[in-house]
Structure formats: C-alpha cells, structure tokens
UniProtKB/Swiss-Prot annotation:
It is found in: Golgi apparatus membrane; Cytoplasm, Perinuclear region. Residues 275-347 are annotated as: Disordered. This is Palmitoyltransferase ZDHHC19. Residues 112-162 form the DHHC domain. The chain crosses the membrane at residues 29-49, 59-79, 156-176, 194-214. Signal peptide: none annotated. The DHHC domain is required for palmitoyltransferase activity. Palmitoyltransferase that mediates palmitoylation oproteins, such as RRAS and SQSTM1. Catalyzes palmitoylation of RRAS, leading to increased cell viability. Acts as a positive regulator of autophagy by mediating palmitoylation of SQSTM1, promoting affinity between SQSTM1 and ATG8 proteins and recruitment of ubiquitinated cargo proteins to autophagosomes. The lineage of its organism: Eukaryota, Metazoa, Chordata, Craniata, Vertebrata. The active site is at C142. PANTHER family: PALMITOYLTRANSFERASE ZDHHC19, ZINC FINGER DHHC DOMAIN CONTAINING PROTEIN. It comes from Mus musculus (Mouse). Its main location: Golgi. The keyword Ribosomal protein does not apply.
Length: 347
C-alpha cells in the first residue's frame, strides 16, 4: 500500500545480521586476553630495551612511549565497558504492523520493527546478534573488546585505533634503535626481549594502519562500516553533509542524551534532522477462515422474525425518533416545552 507520494523514495534498511547463539564467556575471555597481552608486551619493553636506553642517557624514547602506553591502555579498558548507544527495549503493547516513516533530506525511511527489542528502530539503528541489543548509529561489533561500536563510543574506538598505531610504531622504532646501538655487544636477554616485542609490534602495525585509513574514509563519507559492507547508500547518502561537517558530527559534536540513563525522545538535537511523517496503521487483514465467495449473486440468509439485520426493530425506531429535530412553539403564555415532531403515519 503506498504511503507517501511517488516523489519521495522509500528506503528499506538492509537485512539484519544472523543470530549467533554464542555464550558471552569466550568473547569476554578473548577481550581480557588482549588487555593482558598489552600489559605483558609493555612490561617486557619497559623492563629490558627501554631500561637499557635510559641507563645510557636516551630519555626521549620513554618520554614518547610512556604517554602513548597510558593513552592506549586507558582507551582499551574504557572501550570494553563503554555504552555504544543502547536503546531501551519496547513493550508488547506496541503494534509491529504499524508503519512509521521518517524523512531525512528528502529520503524517506520506513522504521523497521525489531522482534527482539519490541520497538521500531530509528534510522541507522541495528540489532547486534552478539550483544542482543539495538545500537544507535551501529558501526560494527568489535570482538577485540567484546563490545559494539556505535554512536556513543565511536570516538573512543577511533582514539584506540590511533593510539595503537602510534604506540606500535614507537615500540618498533625503539626496539630497532636498541638493536642497532647494541649490535657490537654479544647476544643478551635485553636483545631477546627486544626481538620478542618488535615482532608483534610490526605484525599489528600494518593492519591497524589500514583499519585507521578505512575508518577515516567512512567518517568522511558519513557512512558506517555496516552500511558500507551492505552497500546501503549506493547512489545518494542523505546523511552526508560534507567533509568538514561529517568529521565534526562524528568526533566533536555533543553526543546528546544517554538512552540508558533515562527515557528520552529519540530525536537528537545535533546532527541530521529527522522529520516524523504521519503514522498510518497497516490495512486490516481478512481472517484465514473467511474466504470471499464466488462472483455473481450471493445467497442471502433467511430472515427470522424478531432477529432482523442491525439497525431494525423497535429500538431502531426509538433512536430514529430521538434523532428528529425538536421544535419550539410560541404561545401567548410563553414558550412551550420542546416536542418531537410526529413520524409519518402517526395520528
């Protein structure tokens, strides 16, 4: 059934990710392992090659790698426990057949019904099968931190990727510098630990740099990783407001209200405006046991005395008399009380 005018394009959101019935325990252990790996490699770095450089007067290396380690560790731990933009679950009172439409820059979006969260999802909001939640501006589910990346923690995710790139590069440069300075010395424990730290740092550096580049391109186009993977906006992206405005909205604009702290309106004060269209319920469906009859004259049921069709009988006649307009007659003694006009056929 057409709901809007033909001039407005109605867009349907991409198909949801398949439900994955996995336990939270393995993913949580993997996220904890990543934090432990960061602490372990950093401990080896600061305890062996960096210590030797400091003892020989090279203070520039710990002055650079120290703050980068603190920033990386803080962003990694914070991202594990951050709120990606979880929306409140609905109730069973909401009708899933009701059609809700919003318009964004002359592009109409039909709000899809989430059968798990029991509400109509706003634009760019998707249900994560791993976390079993609906996330506003869903980007992707990061298994490294066992958390979704969405509207409220995307900046923290970008900070983590950037700090990991810089920290991995600083570790690699420092370890190579240490190996070059000690090339004339025999093999020692410090050299072994430097090689042990430099190999994983070099292995993580290239993938992290590519990930940072991909995320930067996505922010420039105002397109999330999930939308880019599904080719959600192949021709025209209504959320694209230009290079500078896209970066401002993604990294510096106010985040708006936290939907997990209190029930608030889904309209954000900053960002792309949503215009709520008129809500129209879905057309009624014919029950399965009621089938239309064959074409042509239909059989009429026999009338039983005292059981006529609706709108007939004595009660209907009384209602008809009550609906008749009342007239006010004037008399020399004053106005008389209103009387109903007699129906046709009455004496």
């Amino acid at each position: 059934m057409p709901f809007l005018k033909d001039a407005v394009t109605l867009v349907k959101e991409p198909q949801q990710l398949p439900s994955i019935p996995l336990s939270w325990f393995p993913s949580s252990v993997f996220a904890a392992f990543n934090v432990t790996l960061l602490l372990f490699l950093s401990g080896l770095f600061f305890g062996f090659p960096c210590r030797w450089l400091v003892q020989n007067g090279e203070w520039a290396f710990p002055a650079i790698t120290g703050p980068l380690f603190i920033l990386t560790f803080f962003s990694l731990v914070s991202l594990n426990f951050s709120d990606p933009g979880i929306l409140h679950r609905g109730s069973t009172k909401e009708d899933p057949m009701t059609v809700h439409v919003v318009r964004v820059n002359q592009r109409a979006f039909r709000l899809e019904w989430c059968p798990k969260c029991l509400f109509h999802r706003p634009p760019r909001t998707y249900h994560c099968p791993w976390c079993n939640i609906c996330v506003e501006d869903f980007d992707h589910h990061c298994k490294w931190v066992n958390n979704c990346i969405g509207h409220r923690n995307f900046r923290l995710f970008m900070l983590l990727v950037l700090s990991l790139c810089l920290y991995s590069g600083a570790l690699l440069v420092t370890c190579l510098t240490f190996l070059f300075r000690t090339r004339h010395l025999p093999f020692s424990l410090d050299k072994g630990m430097a090689i042990l730290v430099a190999v994983p740092a070099a292995g993580f550096l290239i993938p992290l740099f590519l990930l940072l580049l991909i995320q930067a391109l996505s922010v420039s186009r105002a397109e999330s990783s999930y939308e880019s993977k599904c080719r959600y906006h192949p021709e025209y992206n209504p959320f694209d407001q230009g290079f500078a405005k896209n970066w401002y909205l993604a990294m510096f604009a106010p985040l708006g209200p936290n939907y997990m702290s209190e029930v608030v309106c889904l309209q954000r004060p900053v960002g792309t405006a949503w215009i709520q269209e008129k809500t129209k319920p879905s057309p009624p469906r014919r029950p399965k046991h009621c089938r239309p009859g064959p074409p042509g004259p239909q059989h009429q049921p026999r009338r039983v005395p005292g059981k006529g069709p609706p709108g007939s009988g004595e009660a209907a006649a009384l209602q008809e008399m009550r609906r008749l307009p009342a007239s006010v007659e004037k008399s020399p003694g004053g106005p008389r009380q209103p009387t109903a006009e007699p129906a046709a056929g009455d004496p």
